[in-house]
Design a protein with these regions (language model features):
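Short beta-strand segments enriched in small/hydrophobic residues
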Residues: 194-213
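Catalytic domains of carbohydrate-active enzymes, especially glycoside hydrolases
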Residues: 218-237
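Short beta-strand-to-loop element that shapes/binds the nucleotide-sugar donor at the catalytic cleft/hinge
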Residues: 274-279
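Active-site catalytic loop in hydrolytic enzyme cores
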Residues: 1-91, 95, 150-153, 162, ...
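Short, acidic, Ser/Thr-enriched surface-loop or helix-capping motifs
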Residues: 1-2, 131-133, 239, 292-293, ...
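C-terminal functional modules
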Residues: 460, 464-489
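Metal-dependent catalytic neighborhoods of phosphoester/phosphodiester hydrolases
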Residues: 235-253, 281-284
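CN hydrolase (nitrilase-like) catalytic-core segments centered on the catalytic cysteine
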Residues: 48-157, 250-273, 339-437
Length: 489
């Protein structure tokens, strides 16, 4: 709405189990509307479960996403069978801004709302907020228990922004994309029955190594029996090398690094993941390798999305890698990959159970969601790196990040698929050599979402722009239109 009336409308695409009883899927696509105060896109509530809708807004040039959300909980004492609706979509708002480089205004509700038709109740606890294109929280309404506030308007919280400041950040985020790698996988409809997915739940122990100082500890690293242990990145090298030295120390497949990694896995009768500079002719790749208990290399992945530092010595790879093991389907990635949300989409679509990510130093950008919006006992706010946290949640898989510790911060962590209400976010303690957690894969049910439901609910008919080159005539036509679906062949 503007001073002259309606400017544009958006009809919700992401529908949850309650929504489908009342609504049909939207038919407006994700539009971006030019206004005197900036280019604005609209997203509704459960849309946040899917990374694609806010990405489509960014691809169409949005500067601001206006997001109508909720912060609902099930009522205290709700039986477990009915408690699967326990969630908090407003606790997802940071990913829209951080991954897409846009301003995000997330408005949520307050108080206890009752449905007069079926008698159900929503237990809203406030927390509306505004976020910068860098993924930083600018202002937030207090989180207030619903018993203390009636439903309705209980305050307006504001800050001053310059919408155009999003443009450079957004374009930087989008420039890291490689649409040729996503085509056609991210635009395909996945069948409800997927033979590639892990069918039988199985227990798995996950471990993320934590190293301090610059030295490598590869020679002394080994997993526990049938454990998946992920080491920090460039696992066989000191962490203070420049690009020229990293290139000089690059080695071919089957070289000293892979041999040492395989010996460590065999000695511990488990699975060991690390990364190294791999030389192949004149090219050097940042390669992640997975070794198994038999002392062999089970899979290799060449990083597809490089950080600025990696670009000074590495060539990007050209495909994601998922390895089927007795522990489940293990995907391989690097920390830099996680900044590009399409990578999460690829591994989700390939039915990854655990994503193994050798990482480096702790990131400056942490989870900034108000801890009061979480139902878990130890919220990740302020201590967990944001990108692995987001990847696990948006991809609905477990993520293990081996990393280094600097002062009070660490890149070593284990990230669960439903960190708001159900699964822990674990970071290695000071002085610990690793953090460990035993769980079940595929990620157990008990909440309102899982990987299968995530795939079933996708609107792949809207996703063609995600896999098109930005110079493609069809993409350009879709972007210029501003709203409405893509009609190109």
């Amino acid at each position: 709405m503007g001073p002259e009336g309606i400017i544009g409308k958006y009809r919700k695409n992401g529908l949850n189990g309650q929504d489908v009883q009342l609504f049909g899927s939207g038919d407006t696509d994700v539009g971006v509307f030019d206004t005197p105060i900036g280019r604005i896109a609209l997203i509704i509530c459960y849309d946040d479960t899917y990374w694609q809708y806010d990405r489509l807004a960014a691809l169409r040039g949005a500067q601001i996403i206006g997001w109508h959300s909720v912060s609902d909980r099930v009522m205290p004492g709700t039986p477990a069978a009915q408690a699967k609706g326990n969630h908090s979509t407003v606790a997802s708002v940071q990913h829209m801004s951080a991954l897409n480089g846009v301003w995000v205004i997330g408005a949520t509700r307050s108080g206890i709302e009752r449905n007069p038709i079926n008698g159900s109740q929503l237990y809203n606890n406030c927390g509306s907020s505004i976020w910068s294109p860098q993924g930083r929280k600018l202002v937030q309404a207090p989180v207030v228990p619903p018993e203390l506030l009636p439903p309705g308007l209980n305050g307006i919280f504001s800050t001053t922004i310059i919408p155009a400041e999003a443009d450079a950040v957004r374009e930087q985020r989008l420039a890291a994309r490689r649409p040729s790698l996503y085509n056609p996988l991210l635009a395909l409809r996945r069948a409800p029955v997927d033979s590639t997915a892990t069918a039988t739940p199985r227990p798995v122990q996950l471990a993320a190594a934590q190293w301090t100082g610059d030295a490598s500890r590869l020679s002394s690293s080994q997993p526990q029996a049938q454990e998946l242990l992920v080491l920090p990145e460039l696992s066989g090298l000191p962490s203070d090398l420049n690009a020229a030295e990293i290139r000089r120390r690059a080695e071919p497949r089957g070289g000293a690094f892979e041999q040492l990694l395989a010996r460590g896995a065999k000695a511990g009768s488990g699975y060991l993941v690390g990364s190294y500079p791999e030389r192949d002719g004149a090219k050097v790749f940042h390669t992640v390798a997975l070794a198994g208990p038999a002392g062999t290399i089970l899979g290799r992945y060449r990083a597809t999305h490089l950080s600025a530092a990696e670009q000074t010595w590495a060539t990007p790879g050209d495909a994601p890698v998922v390895v089927s093991t007795p522990l489940g389907r293990i995907g391989l990635a690097t920390a830099a990959d996680l900044a590009v949300t399409e990578v999460t989409g690829l591994y989700q679509t390939l039915r990854t159970d655990v994503l193994a990510v050798p990482s480096g130093d702790p990131a400056a950008l942490k989870v900034e969601i108000d801890p009061q919006l979480y139902a878990v006992s130890d919220p990740p706010t302020g201590r967990a790196d944001l990108h692995p946290y987001l990847a696990a949640k948006l991809g609905q898989f477990w993520l293990v990040s081996g990393g280094r510790r600097i002062g009070n911060a660490t890149a070593s962590g284990i990230f669960g698929p439903e960190p708001v209400v159900h699964t822990p976010t674990l970071t290695a303690a000071a002085g610990a050599e690793a953090v460990r957690y035993r769980t079940v894969v595929p990620a157990a049910g008990g909440t309102w979402i899982n990987q299968q439901q995530l795939i079933d609910g996708q609107r792949n008919d809207l996703f063609k722009p995600l896999v098109l080159d930005p110079t493609n005539a069809c993409f350009q036509s879709w972007k210029r239109a501003g709203h409405g679906p893509v009609n190109c062949p």
